[in-house]
Amino acid sequence: MKNSESLKEFKKLNSAQITEKIDQLRKDLFDLRFKQATRQLNETHKFKTIKKQVAQLLTLSKSQSASQTTSE
């Protein structure tokens, strides 16, 4: 999945789905760290992609909450 495609998909999510996706990605990141500590991880590039996705989702979440507060 390309970055632009994932960002487009993230923009379609509502705030509850974004929060759920962030929690899932953070669990995945924890699992990757655990695998790295036990030397079972071969795909170290996944750290970067998951961290980037979490950052994108957090940015979307903040912008959605900011737009809701300004519209009220």
Curated annotation (Swiss-Prot):
The keyword Ribonucleoprotein applies. GO terms for biological process: translation. Gene3D superfamilies: 1.10.287.310. The keyword Membrane does not apply. Transmembrane segments: none annotated. GO terms for molecular function: structural constituent of ribosome. Keywords: Ribonucleoprotein, Ribosomal protein. InterPro entries: Ribosomal_protein_uL29, Ribosomal_uL29, Ribosomal_uL29_sf. It comes from the Bacteria. Pfam families: Ribosomal_L29 (PF00831). GO terms for cellular component: cytosolic large ribosomal subunit. Belongs to the universal ribosomal protein uL29 family. This is Large ribosomal subunit protein uL29. It comes from Prochlorococcus marinus (strain MIT 9312). The gene is rpmC.
